[in-house]
Amino acid sequence: MGADAAIGQIKDAKKRYAAGVLKYAQMGYWDGDYQPKDTDVLALFRITPQDGVDAVEAAAAVAGESSTATWTVVWTDRLTAADMYRAKAYKVEPVPGQPGQYFCWVAYDLDLFEEGSIANLTASIIGNVFSFKPLKACRLEDMRLPVAYVKTFRGPPTGIVVERERLDKFGRPLLGATTKPKLGLSGKNYGRVVYEGLKGGLDFVKDDENINSQPFMHWRDRFLYCMEAVNKAQAETGEVKGHYLNITAGTMEEMYRRAEFAKELGSVVVMVDLIVGWTAIQSISNWCRENDVLLHMHRAGHGTYTRQKGHGISFRVIAKWLRLAGVDHLHTGTAVGKLEGDPMTVQGYYNVCRETVTKTDYTRGIFFDQDWAGLRKVMPVASGGIHAGQMHQLIDLFGEDVVLQFGGGTIGHPDGIQAGAIANRVALETMILARNEGRDIKNEGPEILIEAAKWCRPLRAALDTWGEVTFNYASTDTSDFVPTASVA
């Protein structure tokens, strides 16, 4: 869509910098002929202009307000390399099937950003434009981060390959569970849950997002009892085990204190919540790199701005930022569980975490090729309302580089926690064996599980309890280029 001549950039310097108010496109924030440079940061926004606001002018406003513009002409622009520093909206297209919405592509010169700082990147890209009155709504759908910029970040402290080597576990997804109930248990009872899950065959057990240091269980007690459980389970099974010790706290000083204690106890992994903020995430990532500890990221709070299709930030962008910031594990959705997630869209999140180069794929919501410049890969985590009866779907959708976390699907087992873990481990090993034998696990999966359940009572009980449980609701965040998929 080209700019109307009436709002094209004013080339005459006297008119362009005369005191007063100009349209953003007139100030140069729209350039339909611009060809992005390899070093540009590119952003794709979904915008819904107010009635009567031209889509091109709205796109130019987004470019302006996320770079150098203000509401009026300022002569101090002439003291800068304004033409270079000015972000440029260079393409606008209607969103398929969404009247009144437009995709707009914006290019930013690399010099606008501080190296290695997600806080600075987000302050520009999302810092101001989402409250801008000429827009009814605005959503950041995707970004292309140039190699020159990616190389300024350290990325995951461990990565998938090294994690598997440390754990000595290959060729299958990792298994986990979140301790339930998430709040209220004493330290000793909490540790017993951890032990039972690990003894039954899980690789990890996990603190939930809101278990920190409350009156019913001080964080130090939790760490001590959990690591006692980990060590006991390791000794009895001969496998490396772990528990995601949540070190989220009110200050960085306290987070470091908890991380140091976790390391002293021999933990291979610590956990933080997304809500601690970008600077805290990058800081604790650096600590994990220096101390050879895995960093598990719980995406607590993301749904407040990622779920609605018209306004906010797509989770694929959050996943890109977190890979730069440096996390080893990231909750990325299940598609078949209780939480929001269209299957193809969720696969796009996984691609962002695990690929060396993420290719454009509109059906999965990916609008740009992204070269990760050798950054280590993030292990995606599927968690939330999944059970053993869905094992074939999960492996078919996500492959083997994933942590499958069955919280209620382990701890809610009718024969106890250890039986729940056994059911999940047997279902996993059975499905991986079937896959390796060349069977069609997507279609034969239920039959394969039923056959395995004949000789595994815990799996049979799990299938009897949850085999018919599904969460088939229409997703709110889906690709605009395909209908909502179903995995039922």
From Swiss-Prot:
It catalyses: 2 (2R)-3-phosphoglycerate + 2 H(+) = D-ribulose 1,5-bisphosphate + CO2 + H2O; D-ribulose 1,5-bisphosphate + O2 = 2-phosphoglycolate + (2R)-3-phosphoglycerate + 2 H(+). The record marks K338 as: Transition state stabilizer. The active site is at K180, H298. InterPro entries: RuBisCO, RuBisCo_large_chain_AS, RuBisCO_lsu_C, RuBisCO_lsu_C_sf, RuBisCO_lsu_fd_N, RuBisCO_lsu_N_sf, RuBisCO_lsuI. SUPFAM superfamilies: RuBisCo, C-terminal domain, RuBisCO, large subunit, small (N-terminal) domain. Binds 1 Mg(2+) ion per subunit. One of its GO terms (molecular function) is monooxygenase activity. Its cofactor is Mg(2+). The keyword Chloroplast does not apply. Keywords: Calvin cycle, Carbon dioxide fixation, Lyase, Magnesium, Metal-binding, Monooxygenase, Oxidoreductase. Substrate binds at N128, T178, K182, R299, H331, S383. The modification N6-carboxylysine is found at K206. Mg(2+) binds at K206, D208, E209. Its EC number is 4.1.1.39. It comes from the Bacteria. Pfam families: RuBisCO_large, RuBisCO_large_N. The keyword Cytoplasm does not apply. One of its GO terms (biological process) is reductive pentose-phosphate cycle. RuBisCO catalyzes two reactions: the carboxylation of D-ribulose 1,5-bisphosphate, the primary event in carbon dioxide fixation, as well as the oxidative fragmentation of the pentose substrate. Both reactions occur simultaneously and in competition at the same active site. Belongs to the RuBisCO large chain family. Type I subfamily. Heterohexadecamer of 8 large chains and 8 small chains. PANTHER family: RIBULOSE BISPHOSPHATE CARBOXYLASE, RIBULOSE BISPHOSPHATE CARBOXYLASE LARGE CHAIN. The basic functional RuBisCO is composed of a large chain homodimer in a 'head-to-tail' conformation. In form I RuBisCO this homodimer is arranged in a barrel-like tetramer with the small subunits forming a tetrameric 'cap' on each end of the 'barrel'. This is Ribulose bisphosphate carboxylase large chain. It comes from Xanthobacter autotrophicus (strain ATCC BAA-1158 / Py2). The lineage of its organism: Bacteria, Pseudomonadati, Pseudomonadota, Alphaproteobacteria, Hyphomicrobiales.
